[in-house]
Amino acid sequence: MLRRLVGSEMCIRDSAHIGSQIFELEPHEDLGEIMVKVILDAKKFGHNIKELNVGGGLGIKYTTNDDPPSIDEWVKTISNSVVKACKKHNLDLPKLMCEPGRSIVSTAGITIYKIGAFKEIPGIRTYLSVDGGMSDNPRPITYQSNYSACLVKNPFNINSKNKYTIAGKHCESGDVLFKEIELANCETGDLICVFGTGAYNNSMSSNYNRIPRPAALLVCNGEAEIIQKRESPIDLLKYDVLPDRFIK
């Protein structure tokens, strides 16, 4: 690729993507060294790369079992790696950029579900259903992703001795948001708050089984405004067209 770009002025930046939800710092340290080596290789073909975009990949704490590094630790690791490698090879420091997505926006969002029915299978588990599921959050069924949650009326999960499997409303055996999550005693109509849904949930949402998307609200300093209206059944049908040949 570098050879094919000889004579081009477009080769000024090297961009990378090494993965997602990464909890270790070593891969990012290695990335800094590798990207500086790309600068060296590019120089052999007359290119002067002045910018390095290390992408993102920093994980977040979805559950108590997750232990990601801080953003400060991540930035320090990458920048130190690039500085060290540039010094070793006598290179000018490039402009260093990153694309932190999930690590910033995920914890800025929560999802609220309302509890509907309960189903207890004695000696096995207790199911509770909510008014959402895989259409607004496909990540559990797609990636086996885990989240933290609490009852809105009991945000600190005091006396959380009950285990529930929380299922969605989509008539799918895989439409399960939580398996055996510990919560305080729940009742029909209670609200469940799921944390860390600010990234991917909205962008990956769908109208599977003709389920309308929920509304989105912006909450700041005690005020809340709708920033995405709740969809209605009419919204789901307005783009459907019946061909004239079927109309008698």
Region spans (language model):
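Glycine-rich tight-turn/loop motif centered on a GG-T
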Residues: 24-28, 63-73
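Active-site/ligand-binding-proximal alpha/beta "capping" segment
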Residues: 8-9, 24-39
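Charged (often Lys/Glu-rich) extended helix/loop segments that serve as interaction or gating elements
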Residues: 77, 83, 91-248
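Short, well-ordered amphipathic alpha-helical segments that serve as non-catalytic structural scaffolds
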Residues: 32-42, 77-82
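Short helix-capping segments at alpha-helix termini
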Residues: 9, 42-47, 84-91, 119-122
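Single conserved hydrophobic/aromatic residue that forms the stacking wall/gate
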Residues: 1-7, 11-12
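Conserved strand-turn element in the central/C-terminal portion of the radical SAM core barrel
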Residues: 13-24
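Glycine-rich beta-strand-to-loop/alpha-helix junction loops that act as flexible
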Residues: 18-19, 52-59, 98-102
